[in-house]
Each structure stands twice: as C-alpha cells, then as structure tokens.
Amino acid sequence: MSLRAGPSIYNRDPSLRHCAPDQAFIIVIRTYVIARRTKHSSSMKNEATLQFVQLHREDDVNRLAFLGDKNPDVDMPWALAQISGWQTARRKLPSWAACDGLEYPPHLNMEQCSSEPTAIYKASLASRLVGADAAEHGLLVDLTGGFGVDFSWMARAFAHAVYVERNETLCPIAQHNFQQLGLDHVEIHVGDGVAYLQAMPLVPERKTGDAHPLTLIYLDPARRDTYGRKVFGMEDCTPDVVELCDTLLLRADIVVIKLSPMLDWHEAVRKLKNISEVHVVSVSNECKELLLVLTREKRPLRVFCVNDGQTFTYCVSGASRPLEGALRASDDALRSSDDALHAPEIVSGRPADASRVMPEEEFHNVSLPTHSPDATPSVLLVPNSSIMKAGCFREIAVAFGVSQISSDAHLYLSNGAVPHFPGRQFRILRITSMNKRDLRQAFQGVSQANIAVRHFPLTADALRRRLKLKDGGSLYVFATTIGKDHRLILTEKLVAP
C-alpha cells in the first residue's frame, strides 16, 4: 500500500513541491511527531521546577545536585540541565541568556554549539550572499540543525527556513526556542540531513538578471566518530561533504559549510569544487571556525581573515597564488554592536589606493619591504590568529608596507604605527642579543613581563627562568631569530591609530 501526500502538504512547505509524494508524506509525518514531542518542554514543567531553576540559576550545579531529597516536587535532572545550560549561554550566547523561557539541551550540545559572535557573523554572511530579496523569496535549509544557534540567526534573512536534525531530543527543544524567539516562518524536520537533501528539488540554472528565489544550504558536519572521538578530516565528518559536493550544488545556489579550524583550508579547496570564499573566523584572537562558501558557478577565490572588528581579505588564483591584497578601511564599520562580528565589504587594492585592484603579475613583481640594518624600527607588529591560520604573510607585507623579521617568525617591523593592521602593535623599547652583559643592561629594572617565542631555541618558560622574570605586567618580550642571531625584543603595547 502506498501512502501519498495531498496537495495541502506542498502548499504548506514550498521546499517539498518537487519531492516525490511518498518522501513528502514521510517528511511531514516526522514534522508532526516532533510537534507532538514538544509537550515535554519547559512550558509543561510544574511551577516548583521552574521556580527552582530561576532561584538557583547562578549557583554551583554540583552542589545543587545534592538537594534532590529536599525538593521532591522538582524535576531535578531537567532543572540541573537548564541551570548548567543557562550558565554556558551567559558566556557563549548572552542574548539567549537574557531571554526568559528558552530551553537548553545536554551539556555536550551546549559546548559544541556556535557562540553568539560567530553565529551573527554567519547571519551577516548569508544575508550578503543572498541579497535583500531573500527576505521575501529565499529559502534556507540547515541540514545539521543541532541546537539551532546558527539557524536561528541565519533564518531571519530568509522568507522560509528549514531546520533538519536527526537527534530526536534536540528537535523539540529547537522548535520551542524558535517559537520563543519569534521565528514563525521555520519548519522543523527530524531525520537524516542527507536523505532530506536527496529529496530536495533540483535548482534550475540561472541566467544573468533572473529573479528566481535563492536557495542556501548550510551544513556543520559532526566532527566526532561513532566512538565519540574527535575527527578533523572532511571525509571523516558526518555527513561527508566531499562525497555530497555535487548533490549540494545541484540543489542549492549557495552552500555554506562550517569546518574545524584545525583543517588546512588549502586541502578543502583541493577536494571541493567551486569554493568562492574561505572565511577564517577568530574571536578574541582565538581561531574558532573555518567557513567555506560554494557557488554553482566558478568564481575567483577570496579569503577573509576575521578577528572581532579586524578583517583582511585577499584574492587567490586557482588554489594558492595571490592576486590582490584587500582591506576593509574602517574596523568600526564592521560592527553593529560591540560584540558582533559581521561579514566585511570588500575594498580591493592597497591601502594607499583602495580603488585599484593589483594585477596578478604586478603583485608577484612587488619587492617585499625590507628593513635597513642601520635603521632602528620603532614598532613590532604581530598578526592575529586568522592571519596566521590563513598563511597570508606576503599579502600582509605588501598591503601594509611592513617587513618581516624572518620568513619563519611571522613578526613584522615598521617605523611607525600602522592603521588598521590586522593584529597587535607594540612599541619597541630595546633589542638585545643573548649575551649576558647585553641582557643585564637591557633588562635593568625589569622584574615582570609577558614572554612569547617565535622561531627561537628556548620555550617561553625556559626563557623566563633564564631572565628571572615574573609573568604578566605591561611589558612584552618577543624572542626570535634574525638571520643566524637570537634576539630579544622588549616592547610595550601600542594603541593602534
């Protein structure tokens, strides 16, 4: 006996209009089951449990676990999960923590979900990719919904949004939260994301000037194997985006994939077709995410190095050769709030001439800036973590006119402060050798400093013991090798213009 879906099903969910009838029926039945399961949500908990959560949400969860006997009316496992989740949200998702009535999943899901700054960045990225018309006609499909943090921010840029998640525990939590957040245009589907992808209609080829609604598919493949161990290779993640690449590009105009920051983005470019953008996203100088944007048509590859309000972008030809340096002129314009990351508007060329794109042959003929041995540089520049991850060291030197200390240290020198440099800047106080007399003279009166080593034979701890310095303070020591000589650079932090 064949079960078929009636016309009302297709009217209810535009994404099902080209599905086979049996597939559409199964998907909608799963959606109905999830809607029924939401009865276990916070709205159905007794008053004693809700009051316990509200009263103790800032308390130590380990201590609260012993209060079960004294609170027999409290659903203690659920209450402890909510308190722990809210405490994590206060750190990772402050906007959610400030919203009463949200429900939180188990601890592991909270730790694995995106932070608020990175979710906002992806929302702004999606909005730029699909344009303003997506709010009236666009479709977002998140095939790996999870707790729904990324989905909840991205969905606001689309007329219709579909959340797909195979974990039957997470789906009702996500649906409850979406309702609390005012997302009334979303569909929840429980099941395998790959199966849902294969049931999606093919997206027609678009011609210039076409006004058809855009479809964007988002994936955050699970980076743990069946034994719970972390994996980092794309083929080891679930789902395998390398295997699905062709299928994804047949069913979406744009595909955004989130990968581990441990992955080499050059490897991703080699294994996946039609990557048009690579985003290396850091928060507070800690690399958090690697985002890939795939498009149906082949485009020049652009790399975005993002760290809070600092963004540096450049274009590469093929898989590795640079074409141009690019810089967003104003860091402040990248934010709509103090804590939000936003996708940059690209301004191509060198800072001195932002309107001109540097031709490929000209870029490779540019001599890297060098420092004269007789000149004493006044500023040391340290690239942020996204620059380090992207490996765009030549691009930085050419774009800002600064010189590298060495090809291995990835530290730069300048005769003055460099506006908009994507990293930290330090005023050089002294440069010394490792000679005992030179060290004694250079560090006279210095008892405390932060120490970093780059291409240097000693570890930071070993050097600290040798210099007999306490950790911390306002001074910074960078130990590196210049040519064949080991050097220590004593600095203090510089407020960049």
Which role does the model predict for each range below?
Residues A5, I9-H18, D22-P497:
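SAM-dependent transferase fold signal centered on methyltransferase-like domains
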